[in-house]
From Swiss-Prot:
Pfam families: RNA_pol_A_bac (PF01000), RNA_pol_A_CTD (PF03118), RNA_pol_L (PF01193). It catalyses: RNA(n) + a ribonucleoside 5'-triphosphate = RNA(n+1) + diphosphate. In plastids the minimal PEP RNA polymerase catalytic core is composed of four subunits: alpha, beta, beta', and beta''. When a (nuclear-encoded) sigma factor is associated with the core the holoenzyme is formed, which can initiate transcription. The lineage of its organism: Eukaryota, Viridiplantae, Streptophyta, Embryophyta, Tracheophyta. The gene is rpoA. This is DNA-directed RNA polymerase subunit alpha. It comes from the Eukaryota. Gene3D superfamilies: 5' to 3' exonuclease, C-terminal subdomain, DNA-directed RNA polymerase, insert domain, RNA polymerase, RBP11-like subunit. Its main location: plastid. It comes from Agropyron cristatum. The keyword RNA-binding does not apply. Residues 1-233 are annotated as: Alpha N-terminal domain (alpha-NTD). Residues 264-339 are annotated as: Alpha C-terminal domain (alpha-CTD). Keywords: Chloroplast, DNA-directed RNA polymerase, Nucleotidyltransferase, Plastid, Transcription, Transferase. GO terms for molecular function: DNA binding; DNA-directed RNA polymerase activity; protein dimerization activity.
Amino acid sequence: MVREEVAGSTQTLQWKCVESRVDSKRLYYGRFILSPLRKGQADTVGIALRRALLGEIEGTCITRAKFGSVPHEYSTIAGIEESVQEILLNLKEIVLRSNLYGVRDASICVKGPRYITAQDIILPPSVEIVDRAQPIANLTEPIDFCIDLQIKRDRGYQTELRKNYQDGSYPIDAVSMPVRNVNYSIFSCGNGNEKHEILFLEIWTNGSLTPKEALYEASRNLIDLFLPFLHAEEEGTSFEENKNRFTPPLFTFQKRLTNLKKNKKGIPLNCIFIDQLELTSRTYNCLKRANIHTLLDLLSKTEEDLLRIDSFRMEDRKHIWDTLEKHLPIDLLKNKLSF
């Protein structure tokens, strides 16, 4: 049982996980409540969380398979019970768990006769199979069977354009949706002016993350969406044309790293973690997903590298620039690292 208290402006909200169970390796269930909410608030929170849970949570999927010289996806391969299309559909159903960024390679290489399951996939270290018994194909004859795979972390439903795949490489329409279903219901209680609402939220996931983890990530994504409005007043945001247009200076991370090394040899930039740089949660999470953990990792990236990060925006770039302007002077580094 989990209980958290969040102080609101006029009320104290409480949330609980009232039920949690594992129905199978690929089906987790969690039931949560949030209360007390004023009339109408439960519906607002329920709609927002449901949309965020179903559309904003990232998942890892197999997005491409290369069989070799196979003319089309409806072909059959001698010694294999399933057609190429059936194998692609089975690969589409494989549930993976990871925190990888970008595209990774995987493969299957076995010799028949035997059943091929998810446990036969050779994966990079950052990827884990949720259900190793998921079927892929049945080899009925003593043949060598090898497939090259691509794995990607994304969100939502990704449809690949069908082209002429003469090299035997076929795209897989990936469903990067770890949350399988979300329901919410509202219960009203109290009398008169004391009347309030209780929100019940049910979450089913595919096993790549728990319902509690999904709820945390969805809530974090919603907070990130509203952060610009929270900072609008303090930044003096105006809708007047061109008033606050940001023209970024040349992003010279590598040049700054060179200058730092010239001024002070042996500065352990790998010991300065990005959580010390007072970044916003959104910027911090983008960098962490790209495996940028230290100041050295950050300084070694070019502007193009950063802009290729999923969900990384120009606002994040500006924020990083301003933060580095604040923290990169040598005397400040000396004070922080106690040289």
